[in-house]
Amino acid sequence: MTRSTTPEGLRETILTISRDLLNEGGPSSLSMREVARRAGCTHQAPYHYFRGREAILVALVEEGYRALERALREAREMSEGRAPQDTTRAAGHAYLACALANPGVFRIMFRS
């Protein structure tokens, strides 16, 4: 991955890399140094945007819940006026699509 030229771009790069790490190897694979290495920045740069690993996880979970809410809302709107089982089916498909798109984040969102 190449170094971003804007602060907003680097923050998004950090989140994208972190999401990829979670999807590849779960929470234990996420480290600030590995994120920095993959982002092509100094090992301290991610700390400019996030206090640490937990802050990245919180940001990803918040992003995950927003994506899930958006997907469920769209499913409800698309099935408006249909039978209740169609609405339930559409919601189930939306839920599964979100889970399959980002399994690492989803596991953290719903861990016990």
Language-model-detected regions and their locations in the chain:
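Solvent-exposed, amphipathic alpha-helical segments
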Residues: 17-25, 67-78
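Short, hydrophobic secondary-structure boundary micro-motifs
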Residues: 31, 106-110
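N-terminal intrinsically disordered/low-complexity leader segments
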Residues: 1-9, 20, 80-81
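Hydrophobic alpha-helical connector segments
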Residues: 73-105
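Alpha-helical DNA-contacting segments of helix-turn-helix folds
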Residues: 22, 56-64, 72, 109
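Helix-turn-helix
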Residues: 13, 17, 21-55, 59
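Short hydrophobic clusters on alpha-helical segments that form packing/core surfaces
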Residues: 14-22, 64, 95, 99
